[in-house]
Amino acid sequence: WVEYLQKQKELGVLSPDIWITSSDNYESWGGGNKSYHSDGLTQLIEAVDFLSIHTYPFHDSFYNSDYWGVLPEEENFQKRKMIQSTMRRAAELSESQYKAVVNHVNSLQISKPIHIGESGWASSDNVSYGASGSKAADEYKQQLYLTYMREWSDQNKITLFYFEAFDEQWKEDSNKLGSEAHFGLINLN
């Protein structure tokens, strides 16, 4: 579709002001496992007008939990400071994922804007990220993640699309309390 849409811009069917991209996880843009470093990825990077990457340390709190939780040197902290330290590491993980994509694109000697097209934190969950899982989901952690990410992206002039404004209850049809329905900053209940 990227090539098709770029051709439509060349033909004047679409305005040249429309930016064309593909939006996917930072790993898919070459920021993680080297198995993604392929000729096809290089061709995609060359074809898009900008890269739109996703970074979700919220999911990593369960699936790749090395960064998550209280470090030994933080065990004597007050609970609030423990949480703030953990959430700072979550934001730093997003930053490192972004920088890994930048480094990969630079290694190809390609110059493209790189935006964070999706990043967010769920406020609630009753399975993997709730009380019986990583304990990542709650409103305070969501607020801290947004604050830390905004500070970093503003300081570095990086476009960040925070996912998302409103909870989407329809996303968890079989489990209304699941995390995917609770990424919104505003609860519609």
Indicate where each model-derived feature is located.
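Noncatalytic carbohydrate-binding groove/subsite architecture in carbohydrate-active enzymes
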Residues: W1-H115, A122, N126
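Short beta-strand segments at enzyme active-site cores
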Residues: I114-E118, F161-E164
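Aromatic-rich peripheral "rim/lid" segments of glycoside hydrolase catalytic domains that contact
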Residues: N126-N189
